[in-house]
A protein has these predicted regions:
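Hydrophobic alpha-helical signal peptides and transmembrane signal-/tail-anchor segments
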Residues: 1-9
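N-terminal glycine/serine-rich phosphate-binding loop of ATP-dependent small-molecule kinases
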Residues: 11-101
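Gly/Thr-rich phosphate-binding beta-strand-loop-beta motif of the actin/hexokinase/Hsp70
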Residues: 21-38, 131-153, 169
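Adenine-nucleotide phosphate-binding core of ATP-dependent small-molecule kinases
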Residues: 46, 185-215
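Conserved active-site and cofactor/substrate-binding residues in soluble primary-metabolism enzymes
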Residues: 48, 52, 112-119, 164, ...
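Glycine/small-residue-rich loop that forms an oxyanion/phosphate-binding "nest" at active or ligand-binding sites
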Residues: 90-124
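Acidic-glycine-rich active-site phosphate/pyrophosphate-binding loop
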Residues: 91-102, 140, 177-184
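Glycine-rich phosphate-binding loop plus the immediately following alpha-helix
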Residues: 115, 120-130, 154-198
């Protein structure tokens, strides 16, 4: 589970000198995800949609008033109200490319590097020291990021996620229907719908296998 991998390792890094209650917040394109830690021990994970975030944060700190430190990773513009509310209850660090990170980088445009990718590479650097690591994360987009054994972030690639692939087939053609992912996928589709499912899911599977093989 990418979020938990990020949350555990990034909390261990940024909050390693304190044994208090810590909070990580992962702000995605559709959901807010929260992980509460007692020191480095995961206590609970929670989640909510964007429109519920202010109410959710208030309830979270009612349940865990001991939280003293918070780190936020956001791939979208974070509402100032949410940051202000978090700061009312804890010391907040918003992750960015200028944060003190456990790796060096050769990325040519670090200011454009998503904090979701930064967080996962930071987690990989801590979890797998002195090893070449390929980090794959699937969400709205599928990202591939490479960390070398000498702890240097080289870069990676960004590809459309599952929902984006379904939507693009529908949006850029005249007659293909808009579908949602399904659990049962045949390699060879015997109808337009099953052919779309096969193209999207098998395409992603083969893409991931190919990227792993390439690296």
């Amino acid at each position: 589970m990418p979020f938990l991998f990020f949350a555990v390792e990034i909390t261990m890094y940024f909050c390693r000198i304190c044994n208090d209650m810590n909070l990580t917040v992962d702000v995605g394109n559709t959901l807010y995800k929260f992980a509460i830690f007692n020191g480095n021990t995961l206590v609970e994970t929670q989640g909510c949609e964007k429109q519920q975030v202010l109410q959710h944060i208030k309830k979270l700190f009612v349940s865990y008033p001991e939280i003293t430190h918070c780190i936020v990773s956001s791939v979208v513009s974070l509402p100032s109200q949410a940051i202000t509310l978090l700061e009312d209850f804890s010391s907040v660090h918003v992750l960015s490319y200028i944060s003190k990170l456990p790796f060096t980088s050769t990325y040519k445009t670090p200011e454009t590097l998503g904090t979701d990718r930064i967080a996962l590479v930071a987690a990989a650097a801590m979890k797998f020291p002195k090893k070449d690591v390929l980090v794959i994360d699937g969400g709205s987009a599928i990202t591939y990021d490479f960390l070398s054994a000498d702890n240097q972030y080289i870069g990676g690639s960004i590809a459309p996620g599952i929902a984006m692939r379904y939507k693009s087939l529908h949006s850029f053609t005249a007659k293909l229907p808009l579908l949602e992912k399904t659990a049962a996928i045949a390699m060879i589709g015997n109808s337009t719908e099953t052919a779309i499912h096969s193209g999207v899911i098998q395409g992603i599977t083969l893409e991931i296998d190919g990227v792993i093989h390439q690296y």
